């Protein structure tokens, strides 16, 4: 479920990015031979086109309705909660929920697989290790 949300969120972000790029026009396209005019912020009471940017004009052979598309609203909605059934609602909160198969191509782990037997060590304790607990005979520690 998490990868699906990530893919969906990525599609939403790409859609938002592409829709804003269409409104702004293309970046970095200005006439290098044309001198840059200084903009005076006090004279701009109303939004005016920037003289340093190239304004994209509408071609005459393309109908207007192709440029006047309504903006789509992309909403990322979290997935609904997973309903496991009434028998799972009656369980105490610390009960282990059994293995749920999410992808059909993955086999659940078998209960009958035995762990690999381990070899027992033939090592003997070293002679200089002394037992100094309260249960050992002749213990020197007082508890």
UniProtKB/Swiss-Prot annotation:
Top-rank taxon, per record: Eukaryota
Residue spans of biased composition, Polar residues class: 36-45, 122-143
Record keywords: Detoxification, Secreted, Signal
GO biological process, one term: response to toxic substance
Pfam family, one: PROL5-SMR
Broad class of where this protein is predominantly found: secreted
Residue numbers spanned by region Disordered: 28-52, 116-143
Keyword set includes Secreted: yes
GO annotation, cellular component aspect: extracellular region
Signal peptide annotation: 1-22
UniProt key word Secreted: yes
Job description of the protein: May play a role in protection or detoxification.
Name of protein: Submaxillary gland androgen-regulated protein 2, isoform delta
């Amino acid at each position: 479920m998490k990868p699906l949300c990530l893919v969906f969120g990525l599609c939403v972000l790409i859609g938002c990015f592409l829709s804003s790029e269409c409104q702004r026009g293309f970046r970095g396209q200005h006439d290098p031979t044309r001198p840059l005019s200084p903009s005076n912020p006090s004279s701009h009471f109303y939004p005016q086109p920037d003289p340093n940017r190239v304004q994209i004009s509408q071609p005459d052979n393309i109908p207007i309705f192709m440029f006047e598309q309504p903006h789509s609203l992309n909403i990322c909605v979290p997935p609904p909660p997973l309903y496991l059934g009434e028998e799972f609602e009656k369980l105490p909160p610390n009960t282990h929920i059994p293995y749920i198969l999410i992808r059909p191509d993955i086999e659940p782990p078998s209960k009958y697989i035995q762990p690999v037997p381990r070899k027992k060590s033939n090592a003997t304790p070293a002679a200089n290790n002394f037992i100094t607990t309260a249960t050992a005979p002749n213990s020197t520690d007082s508890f």
